[in-house]
């Protein structure tokens, strides 16, 4: 792999450094940060002097990092600006500004909104709105030049899904009635989503953004409860807040189940597109599918368990009803399917992934007939996994094992 020290947009960075240092007395001797000279890893056969290759390498550095370096993002944006100015005077450079260039430019602008949101207080996020607008403008230029680009469609979906919570939902109350057309924005994002084989990790991130958005919508109005310690994944769950039909989130809230189905189907398609079955991306996607299946199993599981075990004061056995049998069957099917994906997601180096399988085995055991051989088998599998995980982590998951042993 070729590596070189990268100094993108040096003049722009020098200007920015002077502006920033001005608040400290305008010193010209400011200490350079590590982002001024970054080691960029380029693919085999890539010209290390190619400016677009450098730009792509820098973006990947940011994309695969902790994403806490606003200065690096500004460097990417400044370099994109410089290349555009150069392209206005250099026909050869103009030809090189491909769809990936426009994608990187738009992505960098949209990522900067995260930092701008942290800077802006109150209910108006003017900088956030401005940067999202600039990102979409840049994307429209790219799509005009490259109308068949799937990468630009994917980036458009990402920007929309990032914008809905960051610019709009954060300021909403339960009684809000603003006309924000959020449902249409979500539908536009789904319509433009496409799996790009050269950017599978970005494809995965876009789907994760939708997953996060649906979770936000489900928990909307319960933010204070969650802050006080009620987990949105608690066993008893929390009821959806009833919104007026005029509320900006009403339509999205009404279609949460359908959107989860679309999301799971898209994750399935993404998993099939990943050729490296032992990659972390494959395991992450498989885990996401497994978790969505467990989530779908929650309602029928709750129905079954409440009918069969709901009356703690009644010592007599409860006869299964048609409703409980149907709920039990559906919950079992979904949980067994979830287990298949969670087993694919296991990482031999990460005991947490083993424990996730064990917990799903416990869920399955709870859905099997009381004290049946199948139930005992499910619990035993979970116990074996938990003992292995505890041994590897010096008892980190002992509390889960203790709870399981109380069942037996």
Swiss-Prot record:
Signal peptide: none annotated. Pfam families: Nro1 (PF12753). It comes from the Eukaryota. Residues 1-33, 311-330 are annotated as: Disordered. GO terms for biological process: positive regulation of SREBP signaling pathway; regulation of translation; translational termination. Keywords: Nucleus, Transcription, Transcription regulation, Translation regulation. InterPro entries: Nro1/ETT1. The keyword Protein biosynthesis does not apply. One of its GO terms (cellular component) is nucleus. It is found in: Nucleus. Residues 311-321 have a biased composition (Acidic residues). Required for correct translation termination and probably involved in regulation of hypoxic gene expression. Belongs to the ETT1 family. This is Enhancer of translation termination 1. It comes from Vanderwaltozyma polyspora (strain ATCC 22028 / DSM 70294 / BCRC 21397 / CBS 2163 / NBRC 10782 / NRRL Y-8283 / UCD 57-17). The gene is ETT1.
């Amino acid at each position: 792999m070729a590596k070189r020290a990268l100094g993108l947009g040096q003049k722009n960075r020098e200007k920015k450094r002077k502006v920033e240092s001005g608040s400290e007395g305008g010193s010209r001797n400011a200490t350079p940060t590590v982002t001024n000279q970054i080691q960029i890893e380029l693919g085999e056969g890539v010209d290390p002097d190619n400016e677009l290759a450098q730009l792509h390498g820098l973006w990947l550095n940011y994309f695969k990092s902790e994403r806490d370096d606003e200065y690096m993002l500004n460097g990417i944006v400044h370099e994109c600006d410089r290349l555009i100015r150069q392209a206005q005077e250099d026909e050869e450079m103009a030809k090189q500004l491909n769809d990936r260039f426009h994608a990187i430019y738009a992505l960098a602008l949209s990522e900067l909104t995260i930092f701008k949101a942290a800077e802006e207080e109150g209910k108006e996020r003017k900088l956030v709105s401005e940067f999202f607008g600039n990102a979409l403008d840049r994307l429209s230029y790219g799509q005009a030049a490259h109308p068949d680009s799937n990468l630009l469609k994917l980036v458009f979906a990402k920007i929309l899904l990032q914008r809905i919570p960051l610019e709009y939902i954060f300021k909403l109350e339960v009684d809000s009635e603003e006309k924000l057309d959020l449902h249409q924005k979500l539908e536009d994002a789904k319509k433009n989503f496409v799996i790009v084989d050269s950017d599978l990790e970005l494809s995965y991130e876009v789907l994760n953004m939708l997953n996060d958005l649906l979770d936000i919508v489900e928990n909307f109005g319960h933010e204070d409860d969650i802050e006080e310690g009620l987990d949105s994944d608690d066993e008893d769950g929390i009821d959806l807040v009833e919104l007026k039909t005029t509320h900006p989130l009403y339509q999205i809230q009404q279609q949460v189940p359908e959107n989860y189905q679309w999301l799971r189907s898209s994750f399935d398609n993404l998993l099939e597109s990943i050729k490296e079955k032992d990659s972390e991306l494959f395991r992450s996607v498989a885990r996401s599918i497994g978790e969505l299946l467990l989530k779908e199993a929650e309602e029928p599981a709750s129905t079954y368990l409440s009918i069969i075990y709901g009356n703690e004061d009644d010592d007599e056995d409860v006869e299964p009803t048609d409703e409980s049998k149907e709920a039990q069957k559906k919950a079992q099917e979904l949980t067994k399917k979830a287990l298949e994906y969670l087993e694919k997601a296991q990482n031999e180096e990460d005991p947490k992934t083993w424990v996730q399988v064990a917990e799903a085995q416990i869920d399955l055991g709870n859905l099997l007939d009381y004290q049946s051989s199948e139930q005992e088998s499910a619990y035993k599998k979970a116990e074996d996994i938990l003992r292995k995980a505890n041994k590897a982590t010096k008892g980190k998951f002992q509390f889960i094992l203790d709870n399981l042993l109380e069942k037996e």
